[in-house]
């Protein structure tokens, strides 16, 4: 039974060692070296690099503008109030806001609370 487990392990070990040998044959320095020398590029490679950079820049700007449009479109924009119904609602809102201000600022303090919340008398018999 243990014999059947051994060949896959052996094949896997040989494959790993073979790949490790291939990596040692390739120079690590050129891959991990942080310096980039544009003089080593020929004209076609430099054009491809420039096109890729421009494409990435355009995609970045497109994403930024789409994000700005999404946030701008989510704001509530008020329409112009030209109809009679709209003007009536607007005037009623203004009067209700100013009514509380008038009540609190212009009524004498002796009258305010007791008059508006006193006992209600029903004169309908």
Swiss-Prot record:
Query: What one GO molecular function would you report for this record?
Result: hormone activity
Q: Name one Pfam family in it.
A: Calc_CGRP_IAPP
Q: In the UniProt record, does the keyword Signal occur?
A: yes
> Which InterPro entries does the UniProt record give?
Calcitonin-like, Calcitonin/adrenomedullin, Calcitonin_CS, Calcitonin_gene-rel_peptide, Calcitonin_peptide-like
- Signal peptide range equals 1-25
Is Signal included in the keywords of this UniProt record?
Answer: yes
Gene Ontology terms describing biological process: adenylate cyclase-activating G protein-coupled receptor signaling pathway; regulation of cytosolic calcium ion concentration
**Which residues of the precursor form the propeptide?**
26-77
Q: Which domain of life is it from?
A: Eukaryota
UniProt keywords (A-Z) are: Cleavage on pair of basic residues, Disulfide bond, Receptor, Secreted, Signal
Q: What is its main location?
A: secreted
Q: List cystine links.
A: 81-86
> What does the UniProt entry say about where the protein is found?
Secreted
Q: Name one GO cellular component term.
A: extracellular space
Report the protein's function. Stimulates cAMP production via the calcitonin receptor (CT) but not via the CT-like (CL) receptor.
Entry similarity comment: Belongs to the calcitonin family.
- Name this polypeptide is given: Calcitonin receptor-stimulating peptide 1
Q: Which organism is it from?
A: Ovis aries (Sheep)
Q: What lineage is on file?
A: Eukaryota, Metazoa, Chordata, Craniata, Vertebrata
């Amino acid at each position: 039974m243990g014999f059947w487990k051994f060949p896959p392990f052996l094949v896997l070990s040989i494959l790993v060692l073979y790949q490790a040998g291939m990596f040692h044959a390739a120079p690590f320095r050129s891959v991990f070296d942080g310096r980039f020398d544009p003089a080593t590029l020929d004209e076609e490679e430099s054009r491809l690099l420039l096109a890729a950079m421009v494409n990435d820049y355009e995609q970045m700007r497109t994403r930024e503008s789409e994000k700005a449009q999404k946030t701008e479109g989510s704001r509530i924009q008020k329409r112009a109030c030209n109809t009679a119904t709209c003007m009536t609602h607007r005037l009623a809102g203004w009067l209700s806001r100013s009514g509380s201000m008038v009540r609190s600022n212009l009524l004498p303090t002796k009258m305010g609370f007791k008059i508006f919340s006193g006992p209600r008398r029903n004169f309908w018999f």
